[in-house]
Amino acid sequence: MLVRSIHLTTRRYVTCLILAAMGISSLSGCSRQFWRKQADKDTYNNIGQKLNDTRWELPRIDLIPDGRSRFFDPYDPDKEPLPPDDPAAHVFMHSVNGRRGYKSWHKLGASFAIENPNWLENYGIDMNGMDPVAGHSEVKLLKVTLPELVDLSYIHSRDYQTNLEDLYISALALTQQRYNLGVRYLGVNGSEPFVDGTATTLGNGRANGFSTAAFGVSQLLPSGGQIAVELANAVTWNFGQGGSISAPLLGYSVTQPLMFRAGRKVVLEPLTQAERDVLYNARSMARFRQTLFVGVSTSYLNLLLQRQLILNQLNNIRQLEEQYEKQKALDSRIPGFVTEKLENFPQLRQLIPDDLKARFTYDDLWLKWDGPMSEEDEQRLLSLSDSDFYRAAIQQLIGWKNQDVTSLASYQLLTQLQNAQATLATQRRVLADSQDSLKRDLGLPPNVQLDINENGLAPFEIISWDLIELERRMREIQKNLGKQLLPDLGENQADTPPDFATLRAYVDGLVELRNDLREKGINVVMNDLKPIEDLLNTTQDDWKASRPDQRFFRSEEERNLLVQNYQKDKATFERAERDFMFGSDQLDMLLRLIDVETQDDILKTLDSDSNGMIESSELPQAWSDLPRLGTKTAADTYTLDAFLSEVRDGSRILRDDYLLRLAQQLEVLQAGLRVEAIAINRFTLPESQEFPEIEQVVEIGLENRLDLMNNRAQVMDARRRMEIAANSLESTLNLTFQGSQGLSGGNRILDSNQTARLEFTTPLDQIDERNAYRASLITYQRQRRSYMQSEDTISLNIRQNWRQLQVQEYRLEIDRRAVRTAALQYDNASLLATAVVQQGAVNITLALNTLLNAQNTLAQDWVTYETNRLNIFVNMGIMQLDPRGVWDDPFYLQMNDLQDDGTVSPAMTPGVVLPNSQPQN
């Protein structure tokens, strides 16, 4: 019975131990979620304490990305499903080196995508549980403004998220350092609270047990001392006798270093550095937001520039094509008069038939033919003589008449055109590459369809596209209808009357073009005069008094030059207006004269005396002013055919000189006016309208650059680390007091135990410490030099930006004049290119290249100026951003119709075009 009782008692004890172990296991620790949320609470609190200056305020410190972000994680962060894995590598999770792996990897499930599986839903794309990578190409972001690009970067930018996480990690490290100096649950020996139990079965059938439990607290003092108090209890069970012995004990320990690791400068250093690191990272995050805006803005401006270069190149190609077509038309003209040398053949004069003498002559040296030549004429000429010399000369004469000539000018223009087309292809490739790079920087896939809003190109549309299109239509009507009225063969043809229906359609078309020229040419150019007039009126008394939205003058001489140009432009416009009114009246007259159903109705309308002729007295008085070919004047009487021929000739001259030529003049005038009106955002400091001095902006930069503040503080960090390294060279001298006191009822005062200990270590084996100290001295000197270099680099960058801004201001004034000059040069060269006798196409190709280069340089210099303005503000560290990350500069706020006092929210949604939407206008 006794043995059985012992076994039962042992079994109960073992059962108790198992139950106790199970209970203890339930106290193994708090959940992952608890610790994560606690870490977030402490960390965000630490970050918030450092955001105590407006210069490094942050609109967001939460690590959780925007729900629309591509890398937003929709799953429980503490119970993440397994992401997609590489199939070959995944095998080793289930079997490694012949051993079965962990079998419960998939208990939380598996996701089908690494990126946010729902992020495409914001763009109207439902992937139905498929990897969103397959839907990237369906995303369409059209006409995205710069503020919207910044929004996209805050939603999707990986670099922004990484910088935010760096700030969080530094603040997380700070929580550890603060905790180290607080009350910790560590006992006298640095152990955490514990319970330890042991059960023993003896060979004689007896059993006993032993358990130990301890709970203590300690605190590290700023001076380096450490205080610890611990309550421990030891219990012994004797199961055979049914008794137990308990021995509770209260212990304490006080340790104070006196040399090594002693003093506040050593003990508080980790906490000091951690506090400073959070401040550094907060400033770095604020600095990153500034550089992020500058980076996105620079990319946006460069895309605008590349697009403008493409538009300029397209216009250049259009002009080259026009000139090439004109040159081919000149080349295709059949010569009316040709000659060929034939010496000493006097008998030919008697052989020429009388009916050919009007067209074929010989002066004993040259064979001459004037007019058209038919195949019958060719055979008759060949039959006049059997002389080999004569027949060879006649064959050459016929060849000159029938040859298909391609002039040198045509080849030059064609070569220039082909080069321009090749350049355009390269420019389009560069634009596409730049767009893909921007998408990557924003955090978007490169195959997303993203186009930027091109409203920023409006100032560089120096010639209205409507006016350019109108000029093209004027050429088209001549190509389609004009040649039907009088084929341009270069022959002395009989005055064949035009087809009435074609003539009527031609005049109707010219009237329509005239109306469009009034609306898209005269009226538009009239409006282009107003900004210049307004600018001159604003600055009449003070040349510096231009408004922020207007062009400013660098000197009074610059304004005076604009006054002169404006007066010339206004006089040119007034002449063009008068010419337009004259041509318009003439067209109206022609339209009234032929506004009948058939050409026979013209006589019925105009022939008042019914004599079958149209007399000058029966025509409007303005008829005598109708432009005519050569030196022709109005006749006294006209047959119907002669009248229609004169209407045809007059309408064609009106098209050439009073519509097409006037449109070209308006283009040149418009280019000059618009280029004068282009404004730049002048570099000024707040509450000032003057260009600041270079030393002033450098001083501002050295005072406000956040990264320089960090660099300056890091010099002090290196200096403090010298002291820490020096402390490690000292001897170890620690004073320790320890004691314990039994707490059982029978304990007496003699049961307590008190100990005092003095610990000393000689500093003899200190090579590592010596080297560390010497290295800290070098590190400090390096940090000093690094700060000086940072200071000098900032100063250098600001000075370079300042000089570049001044140079760009000057260059832009030169660019204005260059565009004016190039437009006039092309206009003159275009007129000369229509001459029958040319020396190649050097003038026209040179003029086109000059105009293209002037337009490109203007756009490039403007973008370079604005880029440097961005850089100098960010280099000075005074770029203030709104909550979305957009600079509170009026130029950038107006891109989204915001004002200086406009309220905005972070991460506004850019305009989204759904996959099945209607085409954009």
What is each PLM-predicted segment?
Residues 29-31:
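N-terminal Sec signal peptide cleavage junction
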Residues 163, 167-174, 288-313, 323, ...:
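Amphipathic alpha-helical coiled-coil segments
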Residues 1-11:
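N-terminal secretory signal peptides that target proteins for export/translocation
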Residues 33, 132-136, 140-152, 156-160, ...:
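Small/polar-residue-enriched beta-strand and adjacent coil segments characteristic
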Residues 171-174, 179, 185-188, 192, ...:
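Hydrophobic, small-residue-rich alpha-helical packing segments that form membrane-like cores
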